[in-house]
Amino acid sequence: MADTCPRCGSPGVVGDGCPRCRVKVSLYLASLEKMRRPPTPRPVATLAPVALAAPPRATTAPTPSATPRAAARRLAFHGSGGTLFGIHIVNILRTLVTVGVYRFWGRVRVRRYMLSQTAFEGDRLAYHGTGKELLRGFLKAILVFGLPVTALNLAGQLSGDELLANAAQVLTWAAVMVFVPVAMVGARRYRLSRTSWRGIRFSFHGRIWDFIKLFVGGSLLTSLTLGFYYPVFQTNQQAFMVSHARFGQRPFRFEGRGRDLLRSYLLAVLLTLPTLGLCWFWYQARKIRYFWEHTFFEAARFRATVTGRSLLNLTIGNLLLLLVTLGFAWPWVLVRNARFAFAYLTLEGVLDLAGIVQEPQRASATGDALSGFLGADVDLG
């Protein structure tokens, strides 16, 4: 008998699979039950009557430092470079045969594999994007951004008027300054909406216009201050991206301030020449720790312990792998990066998942395509 899908509400579900969201209904219901099941109460022990005795000597109460902390939870990555290499080779061959069209489906295969090999609390994440969505988003990005900017440049060059050519360049720069934040927000919204854990999807609720104002204003201030505003600008972007993200109906929270990174940033600027630029690995590690340690989900808080030395070793190892193999080690580099990120990241504190429910959402892949087109790719963390 036909039924309704418990995840997307689509009617006409026959059997155990939804034809619209492709979820396995029995597994979805089981995961929800697992999340909402209250802890099993312990049996209360009864005390038999005992003979009266002298009261025991008072014992010292445990100090606050002896109180056990909430367990630290970790993400785990179970993928392998060999398996991802097989996916990569097939993607290359199919992309060549289809004159580049298959690359959208290839990108989906890589994302799906990476997320399916990422586990939290014993359950894997899932990716629900499709190649058709990415292709459609790419075509929209070409129509919305690529063609107008190209036409603007050609008009300025063919006019033969220096004033018109300069005006065309200014308008092109203004268009890029608007489309980059549009692409960043669109990519964030699309990718989070296509990522789920235990059948519950992530989402993003930031308004594009708010981020355009933040991005344009921050870019201008960074230029006017000769780059010294940059750590504040980066922190403001991170705050926007994190604070408008949700898991189910519950939001993430970011409490960082850009001025906290200013001292480390200025020190890195001063040490750039003496250290041949290597000091920026330590600044990057400091920024990663700061961003994660000021990110919260409910009462739980993220912790990061990455160091500049470990980040430098990872980068050198990745570069050597790519150079020695002429780029064929790219899948192993992705796996190394994922394992590295999760090895230094924990989530500490009380985490109540029982009341989380799925929110209705809809997101286009146009922003995801624009981010790739403009090189403004954005990810969590």
What are the roles of these predicted feature ranges?
Residues 1-45:
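Cys/His-rich metal-coordination motifs, chiefly Zn-binding "fingers/knuckles"
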Residues 33-65:
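Long, low-complexity intrinsically disordered regions
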Residues 54-90, 105-139, 186-215, 233-266, ...:
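Membrane-interface extramembranous regions at the lipid-water interface
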Residues 88-109, 215-235, 266-284, 319-336:
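Hydrophobic, aromatic-rich membrane-embedded alpha-helical segments
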Residues 129-135, 141-243, 277, 331:
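Hydrophobic, ordered structural segments
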Residues 137, 318, 323, 361-381:
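Membrane-proximal intracellular helices of multi-pass ion channels
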Residues 148-176, 284, 333-361, 374-381:
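Membrane-helix interface segments in multi-pass membrane proteins
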